[in-house]
Amino acid sequence: MLKTRIIPCLDVKDGRVVKGVQFLELRDAGDPVESAKAYDAAGADELCFLDITASHEARGTLLDVVSRTAEACFMPLTVGGGVRTVADVRTLLLAGADKVGINTAAVKNPDFVAEAAEKFGDQCIVVAIDAKRVSGPDEAARWEIFTHGGRNPTGIDAVEFARTVSERGAGELLVTSMDKDGTRSGYDLALTRAIADAVRVPVIASGGVGGLDDLVAGVRDGGASAVLAASIFHFGQHTVGEAKAHMAAAGLAMRLDP
């Protein structure tokens, strides 16, 4: 049985780790390389760096942070933010990323996903989907894709987009609920489940973790293969070890360090 992965997420702005509420109100949470080393030592299964300035301020992804992290850490590293071209993917992989996250560029041109997957292998291409519920309380649930750090609505249905990019070669989908991000009220389980049921690739649940039970629900109810969280780890509410033990006690298959 494949083991569920716990993935701390480091949102990086101006070279520092930050954590905001619904992509705003950024709060400094430390140095990214030091944070990464701490998570590696704590037994995180993977780590995710998202350069949240890159897409809308046209800044290059933090290659120096990536290379220093890759030198210091053994866990797999996913890096996203401002990835627009095959050359961007190559540069990040050469800097030490194991996987590269594509967001806005995949929405603008899903064929870019196919091109990147063909050149580097689908196992290292992660498409990041930022979605917001647009259906009313009495309507069938529907979510829309947003780009540029959650600023730009696209009119694109999130579940259909997930199908499209998975068919084009995305090896994994990072699904973030913009309604839930930073609220600490739990994942949007309906969104996560709708996408997990629609595709054959692993789905990472993201956005809204407030406690350890939310991680369990992301897998058990949301159908996710991995769970991503930030605040509960960054500010010391829980350790990765506590999260793994809690999820294992709930009957989920976890990689437990001796």
UniProtKB/Swiss-Prot annotation:
Pfam family membership, one: His_biosynth
Name of the protein in its database record: Imidazole glycerol phosphate synthase subunit HisF
CDD domains listed in its UniProt record: HisF
Listed transmembrane segments: none
Record's keyword annotation contains Amino-acid biosynthesis: yes
Gene Ontology biological process terms, A to Z: L-histidine biosynthetic process
HAMAP family assigned to the protein according to its UniProt record, in alphabetical order: HisF
Principal subcellular localisation of the protein: cytoplasm
Catalysed reactions, as listed in the record: 5-[(5-phospho-1-deoxy-D-ribulos-1-ylimino)methylamino]-1-(5-phospho-beta-D-ribosyl)imidazole-4-carboxamide + L-glutamine = D-erythro-1-(imidazol-4-yl)glycerol 3-phosphate + 5-amino-1-(5-phospho-beta-D-ribosyl)imidazole-4-carboxamide + L-glutamate + H(+)
Assembly with partners or alone: Heterodimer of HisH and HisF.
Organism classification: Bacteria, Pseudomonadati, Pseudomonadota, Alphaproteobacteria, Hyphomicrobiales
Organism: Methylorubrum extorquens (strain CM4 / NCIMB 13688) (Methylobacterium extorquens)
EC number: 4.3.2.10
Function noted in UniProt: IGPS catalyzes the conversion of PRFAR and glutamine to IGP, AICAR and glutamate. The HisF subunit catalyzes the cyclization activity that produces IGP and AICAR from PRFAR using the ammonia provided by the HisH subunit.
